[in-house]
Amino acid sequence: MKHLLWLAFFALPAFAQGPALDDLSKDDLEKVSNEIAVNFSHTAVAAPSTDGLWGIELGLIGGVTGSPKMKELVEDAGEDGSDFKRLPHAGLMARAHFPLELFAELTFIPTVESSDLELSNRTFALGWNFGSFFSWPLDVAIGAQTSNSKLEFDQVLNNASTGNTNVDTTVKFDSKTTTLWVGASKTFAIVTPYVKVGVFKSETDVEVNGSSGDIFDFSSEQKESVSSSGGFGTLGVNVNLLIVRLGLEASRAAEV
């Protein structure tokens, strides 16, 4: 489950360090890759609504995604998995709406580097509020959204593929997601609840860069690709306070 708070500054800290992964089965790789992909998939924590011919919003987003498989795999590798039971994320958001009740959303995390980890994320969404276009009593919209995230971390690998010697490696997750949805919202005074449902797909390339070694138990290659798909659903609420909009959202995609 992915939980998000718009303008929630306490949710902004990102990964302090990279996880340790080893001996991943195909199922392990698919599940942990999907957790990472869902965590960095698109959201602006905004109702699928429009207001007037033109408009733009700027803000911050932050939140966490439950990641039981990541925690399990880190512990299987002999490390403390408690720091990875939830994956954090944060970023900048821009949202604009245009004539004909069209709207676009953009979020991004500038490339962030620590001593052993690097992270970047870009997402984009486009939607049409046909409920407002046809003057219906509530906003009903369709939309499509994509994301492209990169997470890489340094790891000392020691397993059969390295001859049981320590090898310095960099593990890279390059994830892309696509979501198609239909949503509805209705404003009551300053409160706007909303819902979205649709379909979600992720594709992830996982690569180990080092002089030797891999982290897969089903392959001797240093690079593997996996994908996942499933349903998508979001429940959220916006609170409009003069020039500030606050939001809270919970979503689920492909069983994460």
Place the predicted regions along the sequence by residue.
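Sec-dependent N-terminal signal peptides
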Residues: 3-13
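Transmembrane beta-barrel domains of Gram-negative outer membranes and organellar outer membranes
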Residues: 17-133, 147
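Residues on the lipid-exposed face of transmembrane beta-strands in outer-membrane beta-barrel proteins
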Residues: 47, 60, 92-98, 124-128, ...
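Transmembrane beta-strands of outer-membrane beta-barrel pores
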Residues: 62-66, 108-112, 130, 144-150, ...
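Flexible, solvent-exposed coil segments and beta strand-coil junctions
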Residues: 99-106, 158-165, 214-217, 239-243
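Repeated loop/turn-to-beta-strand initiation elements of outer-membrane beta-barrel proteins
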Residues: 100-106, 133-140, 190-193, 241-248
